[in-house]
């Protein structure tokens, strides 16, 4: 057992990032307190603080593995709770332009899981509740992070839903609030600059509903229908979730939000680039109303660039970098950040002051994963000329390289596995720059001209 190195740590937010962070801290502090403004449901249910819960959430294989490092055996917990197993390369039908009817099906040797956001939160929360020194206080809102006289973190001020105010002391505070405003407010209150920001304005609007899975044989469990951008931005997702249900989503960019009824929703599905999803659901029983959600921009707050990092404050998950949800990276990066935090604390266990310099070490360690996920989504986002933000100078070359990589992956199973490994954040993007692979991709690019 690792000896605790601090008396109390406080985590703001009980989403996936906050729960995973609490598990990472549990072996290094006497007490860990999670503070959550929402009332925490006892079962599988959405909560007000996560309005996106009614829409598909992807836990990439990299995120699943990070959670397994924090909670050994949690993949089996997810399966026991009803999550749908997905064999990599076999059970997902990817309908990409130029690869009709779909990208080749191959067994890539790993299994992921599909489930609703409320289910994965419930399963992770139950594992956290089994940690004896972790407490979850719901219906409690952090009003401020408290500063010590030297500008370091001293604790938090919070208020319950009935107006009871209190101050909790802490050696370490983690802002996993999603919005990230407690940390930003603390920086301002202590006279520190705000982190630089990079944003990509995508203006995505979602419409999602749920269907009972009808009888029938299919050679897929999950479908992704990608449009021919920029002519169209209408993307379709059909994802299996617990309870023998399909969650079906339509996303569009730069369109006015609307509140479609089922007839309008089905019409949007019918107008996808391929008929696969429409044919699957046209006679299926709808189980829910249509839910809407808007996502204006991806936002990366560059805490790694701050010179004056306050001792005792870490920011992770969406509070540090909010990714375009179309690519399913958010929960995975949050889990990976929590896992590397656990590794950092273990590495520092023998140090006289294991928390000294932890902040900079954490941001430096997290940077490659965050940067990789950001770069994987940035190039395809900028295919749409209406996307706001600074376009990479090498955008056209990157898009041509990506197209060549896809053609090579369709023909070569090893490249296919590497490509999906990078997308699932289990392989570094640097592997795509292997000289031999680059030469083969460049040959594909030349053939396409």
Where is each model-derived feature located?
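C-terminal helical "tail/cap" subdomain of flavin- and related membrane-associated enzymes
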Residues: 342-449
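N-terminal Rossmann-like FAD-binding beta1-loop-alpha1 element of flavoenzymes
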Residues: 4-35
């Amino acid at each position: 057992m690792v000896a605790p190195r601090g008396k109390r740590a406080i985590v703001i937010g009980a989403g996936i990032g906050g729960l995973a962070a609490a598990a990472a801290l549990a072996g290094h502090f006497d007490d860990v307190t999670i503070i959550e403004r929402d009332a925490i449901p006892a079962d599988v249910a959405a909560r007000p603080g996560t309005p996106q819960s009614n829409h598909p959430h992807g836990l990439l294989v990299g995120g699943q593995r990070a959670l397994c490092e924090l909670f050994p055996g949690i993949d089996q917990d997810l399966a026991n709770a009803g999550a749908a197993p997905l064999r990599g390369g076999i059970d997902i039908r990817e309908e990409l332009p130029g690869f009709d009817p779909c990208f080749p099906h191959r067994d890539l040797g790993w299994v992921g899981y599909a489930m609703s956001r409320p289910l994965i939160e419930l399963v992770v929360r139950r594992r956290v509740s089994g940690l004896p020194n972790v407490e979850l206080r719901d219906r409690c809102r952090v009003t401020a992070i408290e500063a010590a006289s030297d500008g370091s973190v001293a604790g938090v001020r919070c208020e319950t839903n009935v107006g009871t105010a209190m101050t909790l002391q802490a050696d370490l505070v983690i802002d996993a609030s999603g919005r990230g405003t407690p940390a930003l407010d603390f920086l301002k209150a202590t006279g520190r600059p705000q982190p630089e920001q990079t944003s990509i304005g995508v203006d995505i609007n979602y419409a999602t509903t749920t269907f009972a899975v009808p009888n029938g044989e299919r050679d897929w469990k999950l479908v992704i229908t990608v449009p021919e951008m920029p002519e169209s931005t209408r993307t379709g997702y059909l994802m299996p979730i617990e309870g023998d249900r399909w969650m079906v989503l339509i996303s569009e960019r730069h369109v006015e939000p609307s509140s479609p009824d089922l007839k309008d929703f089905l019409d949007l599905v019918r107008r996808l680039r391929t008929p696969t999803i429409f044919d699957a659901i046209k006679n299926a029983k709808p189980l829910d109303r249509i839910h809407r959600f808007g996502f204006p921009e991806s936002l990366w707050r560059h805490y790694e660039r701050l010179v004056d990092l306050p001792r005792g404050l870490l920011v992770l998950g969406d509070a540090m970098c909010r990714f375009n949800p179309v690519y399913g990276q958010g929960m995975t990066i949050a889990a990976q950040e929590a896992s590397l935090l656990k590794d950092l604390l273990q590495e520092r266990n023998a140090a006289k002051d294991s928390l000294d310099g932890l902040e900079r070490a954490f941001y430096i360690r997290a940077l490659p994963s965050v940067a990789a996920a950001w770069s994987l989504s940035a190039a395809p986002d900028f295919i749409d000329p209406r996307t706001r933000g600074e376009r990479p100078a090498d955008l056209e070359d990157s898009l041509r390289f990506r197209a060549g990589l896809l053609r090579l992956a369709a023909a070569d199973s090893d490249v296919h596995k590497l490509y999906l490994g990078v997308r699932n954040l289990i392989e570094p993007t640097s592997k795509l720059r292997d000289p031999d692979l680059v030469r083969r991709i460049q040959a594909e690019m030349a053939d396409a001209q």
